Every structure is written in structure tokens, then in C-alpha cells.
């Protein structure tokens, strides 16, 4: 069989159906070689290899005559979906992912199945067959986020798709929600550092200015440039975004400085005007007093 692993159903039952996992600390790299019989049989035809895997797995799930028949094997359900997906048969993949999602068990695999259902619907194959493909895909992405709110992959897909579809309000909302999610250290299934290191920051930087949030866009693009975790082919575009934000912030700073100086000048002019008015009032009072003194003197003489 294929895609098998060591399992302990009794122990897993004590953990709400989830796998019992331990970790080996440190940084490791696995050197994987595909030199087995399956690879030799199909050579460079990866798609055919995956579809053959899918056929084997479906047989194990549906054919009672199959020696590996296990209709309730969650692993077979999941990898039937995976194999159809990698083989480019997205409608079949969708159906098997749905079965795996409904089956329950390991939460990460269940979550990923719902997430993959959305990706299936976004394929050219299913977009041609499903008039409301995006509505359904978006529902699955939101469901996936609801299942594991500390996984940001669905939010990235939502943000990017809405940006490309000219929906900046929604793109901004999802990118802003996702950019604060930290890398899920305790998860193990299909983790992408890129999502958490730079892709969500990039999406936020791409749409923040459209929402008038130049300050947040500047923070996002500044962090991208400072950390430099993106692939080199994205450097020029990201640098251009940063330059635009930087120029805007500089213009804002200059404008604010100008406003401060103008306010200071107005204050000084108003102060001078008040002082002039005060002096005029003092002069008028002095003149009035002198005039009064003169009148009093004249009255005294006339007596």
C-alpha cells in the first residue's frame, strides 16, 4: 500500500481522534529520492503516477475484494483527495476531500481537506462547471479559518483573490486579520513559512493605500524590506511599493511640518495683533485720562 504510517488507534481514541505527536529538536533537512518502482514505472509522467495512486486508494476504500479494503481509513480518504489533486483531477479530489472532512478525526487533516476543497473549486476545471464556484470556495476558506483560526493560509487566499478581483475593502480586511497570526509552531501538516514570513505582509502592503491606511502599508512594506525573507524575483516590486509609501510618508511629514510652521506664524501674528490692540487700548486710556485732567483743570480755573 501507499501513504501508510504507524498508528495506535487505542491511544488516538484517548486524544479525541488526534495523532500523538512528538518532535525532534534542531534543524534538519530530509533528502528525498524518488527512485522506487512507482517512479520507475511512470518516469516523468507525474500526473499519471498520482492518478494511479488515487485508483489504488479508491479501491482500498470501495472494493470489498481488495486485500487492503478499509472503507473507514481516514488516511486513505485524505490521500485519495491528495492524489487526485496532484493528478489534476480536481472534481474527484473535491469529492474525496469532502469525505475526509466529514469523517472527522485528526483536526489538521480535516482542516486541510476543507482548505483544499476551496482550491479545487478555484481550478479551471471546476470553475467551468460551477457557476457559483467562488461563493462556494469562499465558504470553504472561511470554514477552514473557523476550524483553525491560527492557520493563516485561508486568509492569504481570500486576501489575494479579492485583491485580484478588485475588492480592496475585503482584501484589506483579510490581509490585516492574517498578518498578525504567528507561525503555528505546534502544527505539522503542510506548513508554509512564506505565508507567515512575507506573503500576507505583501498583500497588506498592496492594498492598504487603497483604503487610505498609508501608515499600516508603510509598516508592512518596511518590515518586508527590513527582514528580506521574500524570493529575489519579488524584490523590485516590493521595493517599488516601499518607495511609494516612503515618499508618501515623507510628503506627509513635510506637510505636517509646514502646517506646524504656518500655525506658529498664525499664532505669532495673532499674538502681535493682540499686543498691538492692547497697546492701542492703553494709549486710548491714557489719552482719555489726559483729556479728563485738562477738563478738570479748566473747570477749576473758571471758578
Task: Describe the residue ranges of each PLM region.
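Start-of-helix register in tetratricopeptide repeats
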Residues: 75, 108-112, 153, 194, ...
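"A position-specific structural signal for the A-helix of alpha-solenoid helical repeats
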Residues: 79, 116, 157, 164, ...
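Catalytic-site signature of metal-activated, phosphate-bearing donor transferases
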Residues: 1-92, 248
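Short coil turns that delineate tetratricopeptide repeat
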Residues: 71, 105-108, 149, 183, ...
Amino acid at each position: 500500500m501507499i501513504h501508510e504510517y504507524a498508528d495506535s488507534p487505542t491511544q488516538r481514541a484517548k486524544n479525541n481522534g488526534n495523532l500523538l505527536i512528538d518532535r525532534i529538536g534542531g534543524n534538519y533537512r530530509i533528502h528525498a529520492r524518488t527512485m522506487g518502482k512507482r517512479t520507475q514505472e511512470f518516469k516523468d509522467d507525474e500526473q499519471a503516477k498520482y492518478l494511479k495512486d488515487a485508483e489504488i486508494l479508491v479501491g482500498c476504500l470501495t472494493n470489498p475484494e481488495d486485500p487492503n479494503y478499509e472503507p473507514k481509513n481516514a488516511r486513505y480518504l485524505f490521500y485519495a483527495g491528495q492524489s487526485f489533486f496532484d493528478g489534476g483531477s480536481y472534481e474527484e479530489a473535491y469529492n474525496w476531500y469532502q469525505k475526509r472532512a466529514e469523517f472527522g478525526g485528526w483536526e489538521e487533516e480535516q482542516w486541510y481537506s476543507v482548505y483544499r476543497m476551496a482550491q479545487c473549486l478555484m481550478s479551471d476545471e471546476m470553475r467551468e462547471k460551477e457557476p457559483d464556484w467562488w461563493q462556494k470556495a469562499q465558504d470553504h476558506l472561511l470554514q477552514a479559518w473557523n476550524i483553525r483560526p491560527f492557520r493563516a493560509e485561508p486568509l492569504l487566499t481570500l486576501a489575494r483573490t479579492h485583491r485580484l478581483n478588485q475588492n480592496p475593502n475585503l482584501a484589506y480586511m483579510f490581509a490585516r486579520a492574517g498578518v498578525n497570526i504567528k507561525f503555528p509552531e505546534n502544527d505539522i501538516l503542510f506548513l508554509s513559512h512564506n505565508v507567515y514570513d512575507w506573503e500576507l505582509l505583501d498583500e497588506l502592503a498592496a492594498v492598504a493605500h487603497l483604503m487610505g491606511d498609508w501608515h499600516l502599508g508603510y509598516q508592512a512594506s518596511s518590515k518586508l524590506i527590513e527582514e528580506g525573507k521574500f524570493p529575489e524575483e519579488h524584490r523590485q516590486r516590493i521595493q517599488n511599493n516601499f518607495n511609494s509609501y516612503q515618499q508618501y510618508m515623507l510628503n506627509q511629514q513635510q506637510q505636517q511640518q509646514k502646517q506646524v510652521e504656518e500655525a506658529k506664524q498664525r499664532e505669532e501674528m495673532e499674538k502681535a495683533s493682540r499686543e498691538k490692540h492692547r497697546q492701542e487700548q492703553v494709549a486710548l486710556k491714557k489719552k482719555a485720562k489726559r483729556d479728563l485732567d485738562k477738563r478738570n483743570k479748566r473747570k477749576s480755573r473758571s471758578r
